[in-house]
Amino acid sequence: NIPQLTPTP
């Protein structure tokens, strides 16, 4: 998993 600020819908 790639860390991300906004979750994917």
UniProtKB/Swiss-Prot annotation:
Protein name: Bioactive peptide 3
Organism: Latilactobacillus curvatus (Lactobacillus curvatus)
A cellular component term, taken from the record's GO annotations: extracellular region
Gene Ontology process terms (BP): defense response to bacterium; killing of cells of another organism
Keywords: Antibiotic, Antimicrobial, Bacteriocin, Disulfide bond, Secreted
Post-translational modification: Contains one disulfide bond.
Signal peptide span: none
Known function: Has antibacterial activity against the Gram-positive bacteria L.monocytogenes, L.lactis subsp lactis and L.curvatus H28, but not against the Gram-positive bacteria L.curvatus CWBI-B28, L.brevis and L.plantarum or the Gram-negative bacteria E.coli and Pseudomonas sp 55. Has no antifungal activity against S.cerevisiae, Penicillium sp BKS-TAN2 or A.niger.
Location (main, coarse): secreted
Compartments (UniProt record): Secreted
